[in-house]
Each structure stands twice: as structure tokens, then as C-alpha cells.
């Protein structure tokens, strides 16, 4: 290989760590869920909290530290569905990127 070919190969090498970080950031941006005038981040912690509550109406702090009154079952369903869909898509995209060897295959 000529030096120019080696340089081109090095320039087009796929940066797996950067791509993985970008996929994670994109997924986390999609986990934001508006509900009942508040903004919530879908997470396993929130899902567990809502699942453990027995009340139909909960008062919960949103991501902007404001208290929100919400229907627990509706919020739980929305948060669970959002989390499952986003993480599933993130997983699929990560599996695709694991098969990529060069940047021009992205």
C-alpha cells in the first residue's frame, strides 16, 4: 500500500466509541416524556416507583423539579412503553454498528 492509501484508510477508520456515545445520547434524548403538564425521563427507577405505588393518583416531581399530579397507571404505561421502545431501538442500532468496519459503511 502506498502512504496515500494508508492515510485514506486511517481517515476512514470507524470510530466505534464515538458512534456508541452518539447512539446513547440520541436514545437518552428520546426518553423525555411530557405528561400532565410535567416532563419526565423514562427510566427503570421511575418505572419501579410507579409500579410500587398503590394510589391511583400520585404526586411526583418532574425533571424540572416541579410537583405534578398524575394518573399513576397512565403514566406508568406511557413511561414503560417509551422506555421499552427507545432502548429496543438503541439496542438494534448498536448491533448494526457492531458489524461496521469502516466509516463509509455507516
Annotate each language-model stretch with its function.
Residues 1-106:
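A preference for well-ordered globular domain cores
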Amino acid at each position: 500500500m502506498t502512504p496515500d492509501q494508508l492515510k485514506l484508510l486511517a481517515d476512514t477508520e470507524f470510530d466505534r466509541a464515538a458512534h456508541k456515545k452518539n447512539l446513547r445520547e440520541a436514545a437518552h434524548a428520546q426518553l423525555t416524556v411530557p405528561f400532565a403538564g410535567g416532563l419526565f425521563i423514562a427510566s427503570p427507577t421511575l418505572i419501579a416507583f410507579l409500579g410500587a405505588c398503590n394510589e391511583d393518583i400520585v404526586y411526583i416531581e418532574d425533571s424540572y423539579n416541579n410537583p405534578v399530579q398524575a394518573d399513576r397507571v397512565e403514566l406508568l404505561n406511557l413511561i414503560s412503553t417509551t422506555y421499552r421502545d427507545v432502548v429496543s431501538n438503541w439496542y438494534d442500532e448498536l448491533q448494526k454498528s457492531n458489524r461496521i468496519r469502516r466509516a463509509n459503511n455507516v
